[in-house]
Amino acid sequence: MKREKKDYYEILGVPRDATQEEIKRAYKRLVKEWHPDRHPENRKEAEQRFKEIQEAYEVLSDPQKRAMYDRFGYVGEQPTYQETESGGFFEDIFKEFENIFNRDIFDVFFGERPGQEEKREYARRGEDIRYEIEVTLSDLINGAEIPVEYERYETCPRCGGTGVEPNAGYINCPSCGGTGRIREERRSFFGYFVSERTCERCGGTGKIPREYCHECGGSGRVLRKVRRTVKIPPNVEDGTQLRITGGGNAGYYGGPYGDLIVIVRVKPDPRFKKSGSDLVYDVTIDYLQAILGTTVEVPLPEGGTTMLKIPPGTQPETVFRLKGKGLPNRYGRRGDLIVNVHVEIPKTLSREERKVLEDLAKKRGVTIG
């Protein structure tokens, strides 16, 4: 028996390239307009129109079902194909099935294999959300609490995540008659076969909503902005991932929330180089300061500065270690601030400077020139 083809796009009044948001808006508008309770004088026609709107939305709101509808013009039972002597035609058909359904063609001919899970549209976990956060070296000293804002899907407050309009209830699935299974009779290369598969329209439950939720369009989720505070532990490494349980998207149809995965990025500080829990700071002094001694100002990662005394006769590339001025390690003990001292030798001298140095060289018996 040949199936009557319906133009679901025409039923919802949307173009064939309509986005999911446009389809959802059209559905919300039409279910309100054609709800049978609003047409008591012509209830039978309204009920038929209402069912068509529901059926069209079920197909066009599901990317997989919509892809099949766009290719073949229907969803559900498959048409009977003419057998030919060349295998090319059937190979193309098999590929179409596998591309669209991600199912082995033999599952279609012989039914689902033992132990194979049924596809259900309920209680699926929500997706994880990945969020990058930038911290400074000062945040790594004692840890930090950083406010973040992001968008996530939350459980629909109108339907409580069921996807069903409140008080609408369920009806038997018209595709499977409430059994949750579809019986198929097919002709193949191997003969005539009878198979059973899970009903794709109801996910094997045998029931479908009488009316989808007007707030979420049947998904059970709505998009919301979320503000929360993320705790950053001391001295985390760049690229560290922190998992916040339940901080991701809401599950489908009452399923659990996914997680928020915070990826920590440590903002480079041009003053320091990080080496584990130690910090390295480079300072350059004049050769006279190295000879005579001096005091230099050294910045601290948490802010402020400390004074470092450079003794007379300090050699180039001398290293000074300021204990406990670095970053905390995993046990809470702070590393060191390592100061590398570079000595700058002037490339040019004034006459007076050269005269003074030459006199000094003679006194010290140093050969020059």
Swiss-Prot record:
Ligand binding (Zn(2+) 1): 156, 159, 213, 216
SMART domains (alphabetical): DnaJ
Predominant cellular place of this UniProt entry's protein: cytoplasm
GO biological process: chaperone cofactor-dependent protein refolding; DNA replication; protein refolding; response to heat
CXXCXGXG motif repeat start and end residues: 156-163, 173-180, 199-206, 213-220
First and last residues of each zinc finger (CR-type): 143-225
Record note on cofactor: Binds 2 Zn(2+) ions per monomer.
Membrane-spanning intervals of the chain: none
Cofactor dependence: Zn(2+)
InterPro entries recorded: DnaJ, DnaJ_C, DnaJ_domain, DnaJ_domain_CS, HSP40/DnaJ_pept-bd, HSP_DnaJ_Cys-rich_dom, HSP_DnaJ_Cys-rich_dom_sf, J_dom_sf
Subunit and interaction comment: Homodimer.
Domain notes: The J domain is necessary and sufficient to stimulate DnaK ATPase activity. Zinc center 1 plays an important role in the autonomous, DnaK-independent chaperone activity of DnaJ. Zinc center 2 is essential for interaction with DnaK and for DnaJ activity.
Family of the protein in this entry: Belongs to the DnaJ family.
Name of the protein: Chaperone protein DnaJ
Lineage summary: Bacteria, Thermotogati, Thermotogota, Thermotogae, Thermotogales
Gene: dnaJ
